[in-house]
Structure formats: structure tokens, C-alpha cells
């Protein structure tokens, strides 16, 4: 899993030549355990150059090998000749080792000694399906996976009639085929349903250990693309392929558990287990509070920026939602003494009032869909990651932050014990201090509201909206200290990763700008001019027929008005495309990758929306039969 965010593969055969010029099949375990690909052809942030290109792959035995298309696939880590990490898998594995070590040390305070603690994740994969013929007729979809222009359909999702609706038969056939392929590869998919937007769907798996779940999600996205074409679909994993309807995310349901099957985010039946539950919940909240800017940077991208903050996705401000019950427990704990009972209620019953339906067991928290990091009963749901990403980036940041915070908790408890405090008193005092300190990150209200944005700034939370500047969080002293002390990433590796992130951001915006410029000048403007000529011919024929008759002015008023409006939009599009090209040239002259990314964000990206506004207006004016691209009503409602 190189830093492209995708998977990469290399196929080797077991054929070996012999002295008599024949060949034999020779199986070598060494070839499976270690490989030697070119490391300079992948993004490396300067760690590898063409003249020093050697890299190594090493078998990851924690993730299952699988057979696809008659080949044995082996998940591997990828490092440079000098040992620097060049992939997303290796630091994720290191973060799991860090959380295992830190969590077991904290559990020892409670007299629990598991052999292993692991982080689990269940990534809910959202996606759109588009008919392949329509997809092929949209160069913007083919090249960027999002529509760079297109007016909203008169009907989209306003009736709320798609979510959990009946799955269209053609889509259902695709889903069945996809699930069969997933089971063949060991991907434990479990739930499928319609999502909110037209032609939007979701596939959710059973929870697995973080590294394995991430591998399976990467494999799932690859299989989805392959299987969709069998059914004359194209799957869109972009976070915001269509304006005016919901985007797609990858909600990562994250938890921690022991090898004994104990979920560390589930309350127990006695005082000690409940104190353990509060300890891990509070330390997670504390980690999110301290590293909220880093967690936002871990999910930031040019594509996810279109989704975050819209009224269907979490805001671009990291906060935690705990629900009424857990919030009350922490508030009570903060103001209690060590002698007070620690109680966490079990699920409550809800009787619906008629006998045919059984009593429902309610979770101990409600759901706040506007929160990017919500406690949902026995896990935290990280809703900010985008649908197209390798979720390893978000998970390694979260794992590392929580591991480092657990290390700090252990040190703080031991410091109080060294002062003569008992272990339980020390745990109480540290947790109470953490609850008080981390209060700014807790928010149970509407994350979409403008009031929350103002309040978040007052609380000192990171409110940065520029993606290139969000990446600076990786190189803050506290982030470097956290990653290096947990052994997840070195400062050099962090700097290289940021170089890659800035470069990817630049190229994403650059490609979109070039595609939109091409569509504007070669597709839209010629059609608009042609329709303008039709209107002018109509005006000329009216003039020829009615001459100076006063009726001519009345009858030609609307065509003349349309000609003026179309001419205005044509001039505006041409002017803004030229300005965008100049802004791109100016940005390209910058040599520093960070400064170039900032220039693309500030000076190039705004033109994408400005040009689109004019083209979308033209779409409503130009003859439908002349318009060169499939419209939203076709893309979203032809199934």
C-alpha cells in the first residue's frame, strides 16, 4: 500500500531455467517472504530518487494471503533500502503495537493481564453507481471521478425516499455478485442498503483487527470497480461526485479489545470494570482533544474537502459526542469522591405499546450524525474519513494518539503513587483532571450550525479550512514527539509524508483545472455559440417576416435577452479559464511544495466553482438536445 493511497502489486512466477535450457517450477519461500521492487517510482517525499531506487517488501503475516485470478497475493510492508517507511501499512502495524503495549500497561493497574490488546475497525463503505455509457460520456467523471459541472436535478434527495428504500434489481444483481467475490477473498461483508442520495449505496463489513480491516477495505474498493463493469456500471468512490446531494464517507467504527474478548469501551458489572471503562473512554477523549488538529489532518484531502462541512457530513472541526448518559457519568465522576459508587446503566427497554412487536433494547447513547467522532455504545465512530481513502492514515493517527495518551496516563498515576497516594486514589485524581481538561472537545449539539464554529474557535479547537495548512499539524512539535516516542514514524518520515500529501493535493486540483478548462473551451462554449446562432437566426427571420411592425419587438424580446445572457456567460467562462491558466502557471513556478499547494488552494481552486456557476446557468438556457454532456437527472436516476 504505497503512499498513492491505493494498492500496488507485482507478479512473479516460479519458473526457473535449468542448464539444459528447459524450465522447472521451483518454489522458494525466500521469494515469498521478501521482494525487491523499485521504490523511486512511487511517491516518497524525497526519501527515494531514481539513482537510489532500491526498496524492499516484507510479508505481513498478520493479514491473510489470498488467491485472485489464479495468483497468490501476499500482503506486504514496503520500506526503502535505508529503512524508511514508504507505505501506509507499516506505520499502521507499528501503531497497533504501540496501542497493545500501552493498553496492557494500563490494564495492569486494574489487575488485568491480557496477552494482547488490539484495535478493531469496521469501515462502512459508501459509493455511487453510474451507468457505464453515461459515465463514458462525461470526461470529468472519467478523469476526476466527480462532475466538475452540471446543474442540480429538479428532483434529487429532498423527498428522503431513497435511504433504506427498495434496492433496484440491477443494483441488487451487482451487489450479489460483489458479495460473492468478497467472500471468495475472505472479506466479511455483512450489510448492504440504499444511502440518502439517488444512486448512492453502502456496504458494511464485520469488525476486524485494524490492519486486516484496512487491507480488506482496500481490496473491497478494487473488487467493486472490477465487478461493477460486469453489470455495465461504474462505481464512484469520490467523496463528492455530485453537487446538491450527499457525498460519500467511510465511517470507521473503532474500538479496543483484549485477547480474552473484553471490549474496553463496554462497561462492566462491578466497580473495577466500570472504572476501567471510564479510564479508556476518558483517555480516548483526551487524545482526541490534544490531537484534534492532527486527526483532522489525517482525513484531509482535496476530495474530502468538498464533503466535510456540508449539511450531510461532519463539520471540518473535530469534536466528540458522548450522549446524555455518558456525559452525565463523566460529570458525576468529576464531582464525586473515591467512595462514591461508579455505575453505568445497562440497556433500557422500550415497549412500543402492542404485543406483536417485542420490547426493544435501547443503547446507552443516542446518535448525533453531525459529530465527526461519536461514542455509539461500545465503540467510537470516526465519521470524517472520505470514501476513497486508505483509512490506515486516520487509524494510525488515532491509534498513535491514544497509545501516547495511555502512556501519559500511566506516568501520571505512577507520579501520584510516588507521592504516597494509593493506586485507586491516583487513578481517580488523574481521571478527574483529564475530564476537566478535555471538556472543550465534548459537544453534543448541532455540528452544522454557525454557532458551533464560533464556539469551537473560542474553545481553542482547530478550525483551519485550508487543506494544505491542515497538513502542518503533522509537523507540530507535539505530533513529532507523539509519533517518535511511540515508534510509529520518525520526523524524517513525517516530513516525507507531508511532501507527498502536498504534492497529491496539487495534482488533484491541477487535473480538475485542466479538465474543466478543456470542457469549457472545447465542449460547452461551442455548443453555447451554436445555440446563440439559432436564436440569432430566429430573430433575423422574425425581422424578415414582421419588418418594422411593433409586434416584432415583443416577439423578439425573449430571444434577444437570451442572446445577451448567453454572450455574457460565454465571455465570463472564457475570461475565467484564461485567468485560471495564468494562476496555475504562477503557482507552478513555486519550488516549495507547501507554498505551491497553498497557491493552488488559494488561487486556482476558487476558479473551479466560479466557472462552474456560469456553465450551470448555460445548461438551463441551451437547447437540451444540443447539450453535449449527460445531465444530473440521467446520471442519478438511470439505474
Regions found by a protein language model. Name each.
Residues 2-237, 242-250, 255-499:
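Glycine-rich, acidic/polar active-site loops that bind/position phosphate-bearing ligands
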Amino acid at each position: 500500500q504505497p503512499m498513492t493511497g491505493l494498492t500496488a502489486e507485482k507478479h512473479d512466477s516460479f519458473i526457473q531455467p535449468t542448464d539444459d535450457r528447459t524450465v522447472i517450477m521451483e518454489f522458494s519461500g525466500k521469494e515469498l517472504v521478501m521482494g525487491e521492487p523499485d521504490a523511486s517510482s512511487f511517491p516518497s517525499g524525497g526519501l527515494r530518487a531514481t539513482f537510489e531506487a532500491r526498496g524492499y517488501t516484507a510479508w505481513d503475516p498478520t493479514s491473510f494471503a489470498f488467491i485472485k485470478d489464479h495468483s497468490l497475493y501476499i500482503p506486504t510492508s514496503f520500506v526503502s533500502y535505508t529503512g524508511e517507511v514508504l507505505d501506509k501499512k507499516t506505520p499502521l502495524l507499528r501503531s497497533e503495537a504501540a496501542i497493545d503495549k500501552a493498553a496492557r500497561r494500563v490494564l495492569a493497574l486494574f489487575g488485568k493481564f491480557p496477552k494482547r490488546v488490539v484495535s478493531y475497525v469496521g469501515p462502512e463503505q459508501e459509493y455511487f453507481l453510474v451507468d457505464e455509457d453515461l459515465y463514458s460520456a462525461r470526461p470529468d467523471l472519467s478523469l476526476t471521478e466527480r462532475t466538475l459541472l452540471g446543474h442540480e436535478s429538479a428532483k434529487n434527495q429532498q423527498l428522503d425516499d431513497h435511504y433504506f428504500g427498495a434496492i433496484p434489481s440491477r443494483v441488487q444483481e451487482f451487489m450479489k455478485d460483489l458479495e460473492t467475490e468478497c467472500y471468495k477473498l475472505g472479506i466479511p461483508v455483512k450489510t448492504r442498503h440504499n444511502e440518502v442520495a439517488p444512486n448512492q449505496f453502502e456496504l458494511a463489513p464485520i469488525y476486524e483487527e485494524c490492519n486486516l480491516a484496512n487491507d480488506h477495505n482496500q481490496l473491497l474498493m478494487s473488487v467493486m470497480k472490477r465487478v461493477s463493469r460486469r453489470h455495465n456500471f461504474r462505481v464512484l468512490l469520490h467523496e463528492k461526485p455530485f453537487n446538491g446531494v450527499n457525498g460519500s464517507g467511510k465511517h470507521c467504527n473503532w474500538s479496543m479489545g483484549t485477547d480474552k474478548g473484553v471490549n474496553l469501551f463496554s462497561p462492566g458489572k462491578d466497580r473495577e470494570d466500570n472504572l476501567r471503562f471510564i479510564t479508556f473512554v476518558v483517555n480516548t477523549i483526551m487524545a482526541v482533544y490534544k490531537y484534534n488538529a492532527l486527526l483532522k489532518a489525517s482525513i484531509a484531502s482535496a476530495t474530502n474537502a468538498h464533503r466535510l462541512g456540508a449539511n450531510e457530513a461532519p463539520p471540518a472541526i473535530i469534536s466528540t459526542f458522548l450522549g446524555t448518559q455518558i456525559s452525565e457519568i463523566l460529570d458525576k465522576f468529576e464531582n464525586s469522591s473515591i467512595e462514591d459508587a461508579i455505575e453505568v446503566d445497562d440497556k433500557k427497554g422500550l415497549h412500543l405499546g402492542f404485543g406483536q412487536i417485542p420490547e426493544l433494547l435501547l443503547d446507552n447513547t443516542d446518535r448525533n450524525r453531525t459529530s465527526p467522532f461519536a461514542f455509539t455504545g461500545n465503540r467510537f465512530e470516526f465519521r470524517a474519513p472520505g470514501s476513497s481513502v486508505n483509512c490506515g492514515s486516520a487509524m494510525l493517527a488515532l491509534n498513535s494518539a491514544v497509545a501516547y495518551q495511555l502512556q501519559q496516563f500511566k506516568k501520571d498515576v505512577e507520579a501520584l503513587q510516588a507521592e504516597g497516594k494509593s493506586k485507586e486514589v491516583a487513578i481517580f485524581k488523574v481521571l478527574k483532571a483529564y475530564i476537566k481538561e478535555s471538556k472543550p472537545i465534548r459537544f453534543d449539539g448541532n455540528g452544522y450550525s454557525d454557532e458551533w464554529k464560533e464556539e469551537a474557535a473560542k474553545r481553542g479547537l482547530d478550525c483551519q479550512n485550508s487543506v494544505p495548512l491542515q497538513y502542518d499539524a503533522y509537523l507540530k512539535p507535539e505530533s513529532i514527539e507523539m509519533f517518535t516516542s511511540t515508534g510509529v514514524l520518525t520526523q524524517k518520515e513525517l516530513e516525507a509524508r507531508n511532501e507527498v500529501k502536498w504534492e497529491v493535493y496539487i495534482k488533484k486540483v491541477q487535473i480538475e483545472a485542466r479538465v474543466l478548462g478543456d470542457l469549457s473551451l472545447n465542449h460547452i462554449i461551442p455548443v453555447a455559440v451554436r445555440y446563440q446562432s439559432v436564436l440569432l437566426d430566429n430573430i433575423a427571420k422574425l425581422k424578415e417576416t414582421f419588418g418594422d411592425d411593433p409586434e416584432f419587438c415583443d416577439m423578439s424580446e425573449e430571444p434577444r435577452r437570451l442572446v445577451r445572457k448567453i454572450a455574457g456567460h460565454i465571455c465570463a467562462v472564457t475570461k475565467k479559464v484564461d485567468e485560471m491558466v495564468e494562476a496555475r502557471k504562477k503557482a507552478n513556478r513555486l519550488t516549495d511544495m507547501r507554498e505551491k499547494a497553498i497557491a493552488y488552494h488559494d488561487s486556482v481552486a476558487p476558479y473551479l466553482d466560479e466557472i462552474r456557476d456560469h456553465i450551470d446557468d448555460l445548461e438551463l438556457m441551451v437547447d437540451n438536445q444540443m447539450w453535449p454532456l449527460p445531465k444530473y437527472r440521467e446520471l442519478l436516476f438511470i439505474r
